[in-house]
Amino acid sequence: AVARYLSRYEGRMLVLEKAEDVCCGTSKANSAIVHAGFDAAHGSLMAKMNLEGNLMMPQLAKDLDFAFKMNGSLVVCMSEEDLPKLRALYENGVKNGVKELEIVDAKRLHELEPNVSKHAVAALWAPTGGIVCPFNLTIALAENAFDNGVEFQFNTEVTGFTWEDGFWTIHTNHGDFESRYVINAAGVYADVLHNMVSTRKLHITPRRGDYCLLDKNTGDFVSHTIFQLPGKLGKGVLVSPTVHGNTIVGPTAIDIDDREGTNTTAEGLNDLIEKAGATVEHLPIRQTITSFAGLRAHEDHHEFVIGEAEGAQQFIDCAGIESPGLTSSPAIGLHVSELMRDLMGLREKAHFIATRRGVLDPKTLSKEDYQQLIREKPAYGQIICRCEQVTEGEILDAIRR
């Protein structure tokens, strides 16, 4: 997101990516939720970026052609004793600027979601919550940045920094790179890079979240994203539809030491199934087609760290970007790009490319249009993946960009 919004300005920009492609870390292993913004502490940078990112997402989805749906969310309250917590969540959301929030009673809740537990007494309804495809969002941002001149260097791990004469030398496993400014967006490793240069140290704990993904025949089990009342470790285990028609269940919240620890555990999966089953009834967990785990970059103060690092001029942090990081990413990208504009005196490009064409999905076409597409491009008639009906044409489109 930072690269995409920075690409609006003149200048040479390079993304150093440790993995073989974009969207290989936390960006690919998360809940795929666009949060409304009622949970983050009022007055925090996290709350500000959450709301702004939520408001930006619909237009961004149109501009960059990725899947997004404003399906709304429900935070379910399971006891009368917890109603004050639900009310506090509502009031926090109102202070944060979230529109259309409403506390609904059990009758209205079960009209909205028949599969929610019969023991539920109320819920916080946020119609502005949504779901998104995190893979295509990330890829779309990267492709649009590339179209606007941003360079990418993959399989390149940063190992250190040297500051001299107003420039940073970035040391990597593929040689050195020199830049006036460094933007640190290294996820669970952001504190490691920050602590190499800053006098004020950060500490990030990898927080593992296990998930189950259910088959598409469960896609109408719930229509809203169903949350539990949030606790110290996050927003609890959710049950949500996905933009692809599946149901996703998760995550757990387990603090670990391993920054690459994305293995699932039987204990973690059993825990999330039990917790999800307390919120919804008859969860079709036997329809699970895969399980996975992702890591959240939990900063000790549970706050986004965005700005110039203390004692390290021209080194800009984007650290501690845990949930609602996906939702906040467009706002963070815009915020950092404007910060860089002011610091460097950047000029806007005369011909910025604001849109991007997504990979065509033939399943969205009418029968007649699909037949016409096959006549024009026969590769779209060759099914490579029969389960998901992925065609050769889609694969060729994706790899020839």
Predicted regions, residues:
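Glycine-rich FAD pyrophosphate-binding loop
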Residues: S7-A29
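Short loop/edge segments at beta-strand edges and connector loops
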Residues: E17, M70, V104-A106, F154-T156, ...
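Flavin-dependent oxidoreductases
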Residues: F161-F167, H171-G250, I254-N263, E274, ...
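C-terminal catalytic lobe of FAD-dependent flavoproteins
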Residues: G97, A140, P230, G234, ...
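Gly/Ala-rich phosphate-binding loop of Rossmann-like dinucleotide-binding domains
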Residues: A3, S7, N144
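Helical element adjacent to the flavin cofactor pocket in flavoenzyme catalytic cores
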Residues: L124-Y181, Y189
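Short beta-strand to alpha-helix junction loop
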Residues: A41-L51, V76-K85, L124-F146, Q153, ...
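Dinucleotide-binding Rossmann-like beta1-alpha1 core, especially the glycine-rich loop
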Residues: A32-L112, V121, G236-V237
